[in-house]
Amino acid sequence: MPQNKVLSFPLPEGTLLEDITKNKWILGKQLGSGGFGLVYQVSCKSKEIDCVAKIELKESGGLFCEINFYNRVMKNKTSLDTWMKEQKIDYIGIPSFHGFGITIYKNVEYRFAIIQRLGRDLENILSEKEKFNITVIKKLAIKILDILKFIHSKEFSHGDIKAGNILFGKDDDKVYLVDYGLATKYSSNGKHKEYTINPKNRHNGTMAFTSIDAHKGVTVSRRGDLESLGFCMLKWYSGKLPWEKYEKEPENVQGMKEAFVNNISKKTIPFKNAGIIYNYIKVVTKLEYEEAPNYESLKQMFL
């Protein structure tokens, strides 16, 4: 995986970006930062569209991976429409992708991607509420499982499921999963990657929610994304995770997660009304590395 480097300085408001299809975009105010890049409000010179620009140093790896994901997964509108019809859903919870390119500022090359602008993320909401009730978590789980089913059908895993990467649309009924900087092909043309430990990739992702496979340096497969979602739901419901205070000790976090899933019971999740989360984590952590999950069965747990 390409290495990320921190953006040296922000690009000024008003900077003109030209993507590979010659569409021109004008940077507005900086909206935030994530990972190793910056996020800006952006406007298109030729059409009215509400987007953001994600910008990183050209040699950074995250945005390169994200652009690759969008180009492979989100470009074929016919395929997207067919999927929605087959699944009986009215949207796919992945931001629309509008362009990408390279720009130069002060003799430094930057990579950029133009992506649909969304609303608030769950992390922001949790900073005010601390916890979600089980009704909210059920609704979120169903929507995120729909998104993961689609991503996994394209032979990609997300690799970084967390509240900060889950956003509401302008319509609060719509939920989106963002940030595909760690998205990985777990399979190619139907041939699943073998379970192989790569020490260089150990502990990738966000420590509190990283799957056990990712802790070991194994490519995240479908079960890894589902496991991370389980850890997220536990955090959203209880307000804490047993390993939270050890996040700077990845080996310790890994050991605690392994002990947790190997001995999972209602005693290890001692929160009232958390039985659904308990059952979900129990099911997904028993999946084999290459096993295709039954997404509809998982969704039924939350209905």
UniProtKB/Swiss-Prot annotation:
This is Probable serine/threonine-protein kinase FPV212. One of its GO terms (molecular function) is protein serine/threonine kinase activity. The active site is at 160 (proton acceptor). The keyword Heme does not apply. It comes from Fowlpox virus (strain NVSL). Belongs to the protein kinase superfamily. Ser/Thr protein kinase family. Poxviruses subfamily. It is an enzyme of class 2 (transferase). It holds the Pfam family Pkinase. ATP binds at residues 31-39, 54. InterPro entries: CK1_Ser-Thr_kinase, Kinase-like_dom_sf, Prot_kinase_dom, Protein_kinase_ATP_BS, Ser/Thr_kinase_AS. Its EC number is 2.7.11.1. It catalyses: L-seryl-[protein] + ATP = O-phospho-L-seryl-[protein] + ADP + H(+); L-threonyl-[protein] + ATP = O-phospho-L-threonyl-[protein] + ADP + H(+). Keywords: ATP-binding, Kinase, Nucleotide-binding, Serine/threonine-protein kinase, Transferase. Residues 25-303 form the Protein kinase domain. It comes from the Viruses.
